[in-house]
Curated annotation (Swiss-Prot):
GO terms for molecular function: ADP binding; ATP binding; proton-transporting ATP synthase activity, rotational mechanism. It catalyses: ATP + H2O + 4 H(+)(in) = ADP + phosphate + 5 H(+)(out). This is ATP synthase subunit alpha. Its main location: membrane. F-type ATPases have 2 components, CF(1) - the catalytic core - and CF(0) - the membrane proton channel. CF(1) has five subunits: alpha(3), beta(3), gamma(1), delta(1), epsilon(1). CF(0) has three main subunits: a(1), b(2) and c(9-12). The alpha and beta chains form an alternating ring which encloses part of the gamma chain. CF(1) is attached to CF(0) by a central stalk formed by the gamma and epsilon chains, while a peripheral stalk is formed by the delta and b chains. ATP binds at G172, D173, R174, K175, T176, G177, K178, T179. SUPFAM superfamilies: C-terminal domain of alpha and beta subunits of F1 ATP synthase (SSF47917), N-terminal domain of alpha and beta subunits of F1 ATP synthase (SSF50615), P-loop containing nucleoside triphosphate hydrolases (SSF52540). It comes from Mycolicibacterium paratuberculosis (strain ATCC BAA-968 / K-10) (Mycobacterium paratuberculosis). GO terms for cellular component: plasma membrane; proton-transporting ATP synthase complex. Belongs to the ATPase alpha/beta chains family. The record marks S373 as: Required for activity. Residues 535-554 have a biased composition (Basic and acidic residues). Residues 528-554 are annotated as: Disordered.
Amino acid sequence: MAELTISADDIQSAIEEYVGSFTSDTSREEVGTVVDAGDGIAHVEGLPSVMTQELLEFPGGVLGVALNLDEHSVGAVILGDFEKIEEGQQVKRTGEVLSVPVGDAFLGRVVNPLGQPIDGQGDIETDIRRALEIQAPSVVQRQSVKEPLQTGIKAIDAMTPIGRGQRQLIIGDRKTGKTAVCVDTILNQRQNWESGDEKKQVRCVYVAIGQKGTTIASVRRALEEGGAMDYTTIVAAPASDSAGFKWLAPYTGSAIAQHWMYDGKHVLIVFDDLSKQAEAYRAISLLLRRPPGREAYPGDVFYLHSRLLERCAKLSDELGGGSMTGLPIIETKANDISAYIPTNVISITDGQCFLESDLFNQGVRPAINVGVSVSRVGGAAQIKAMKEVAGSLRLDLSQFRELEAFAAFASDLDATSKAQLDRGARLVELLKQPQYQPMPVEEQVVSIFLGTGGHLDSVPVEDVRRFETELLDHMRASEDKILAGIRDTQKLSDEAAEELEKVINNFKKGFAATGGASVVPDEHVEALDEEELEKESVKVKKPAPEKKAKKEQK
């Protein structure tokens, strides 16, 4: 039997090797316990060092956000499936505040409020992350809004223009075309995107909050068919999602957009709609036992929207000159814009487009109420050509609405009032526009020129849109240099205006109204001058009846 020999050197080297490769698996974690959970909210005890807005990890990898920091417990909003969270489960701190991945890889994708793809097209590969709660640009970091963001909608670009970096509220009752206005605006950016010029290109973010899944799918389909998904990201928090997701979705969209803005690019973000975000935040606050205020909303509901919308800005040239334009949507009830949330958002934004259900039902689409709608940026966000032709449009339409109400009760109207009514009816018809058919700005200028210049006064109201469509088709085919001149110079010179009038007058000669009648106005006969009037007049002296009777008696 072989003798067992033990070498002290071998034992020593083995121990040294083991000690050198030893790593401690112990770690220090702050762990809390779920006290109660339900309706997407959990109260946790035992996390004394937790930060506000810090991410917490629940069993199964479910995340939560610490909102209420009470003396003995933490109130957290659960992001995801909260049905499996029970009393007594352990909760860990992550030491991180909520952030989302950002970057160009998000273009063309549909994501949830955590930045995770939900469109079935694979993972989104990006190394850049951005915190959701981030300070808005300061006054020094901004510059005034001066570049137009064309929506492609005549009524908006002519009367309530939107500039890059502006916040323009779209407000109205349900089913009045609010989403359609925003989708049209996204579709209208396609030409700029295809130009390849980064100064013209506008990336778009559409945030769907509390919408039906079918509605979000139809918006995505419309964007795909219009070739707009190449430069658009959709952040979806449908009605089936928890209140926490609906509350966070706008901040996620804003973080994705801000990344591009600080990179010197231009972004358009649509919040559809902030009424549902406010309702979700109200539900969260009431469940967390926060004191309710007006309409049961918490006291900081104004701050909820102001800190979101203040991120929209036109950055200074030192920071790259990027911009983020916001189109928040608010749903009213019975056209009441004096309710709590509508007045809050009106006071935060730089103007509003009010869509009225009565106008919508009358067939005026987009159903923009000119009297209540306003843009506080105004002419600074318009090209010179549009500013020239649309200067009197708002006043003409406002006077028409007043006269229309008066004419309903009065039978006798003077010629001036009748002329105003006739022109106003044609302007209303001219501003109607089909859904998902945005119009280039140079064609809008020609269209508005037709109305404000009185060139449609001889065209029957029912033929106004056909006249406009056929004239623009004719100009694209044979008079494209006028359109190209407006597009390139962004001005309508006197020579171009005269040439445009000639084209319109020549086109009128070949245009026939529905009944076959000509739309060329009758030749205007000028009144005689005073000198000619004296030459033509014949003076006849007749004696007075009394004197004539006395002569007969004599």
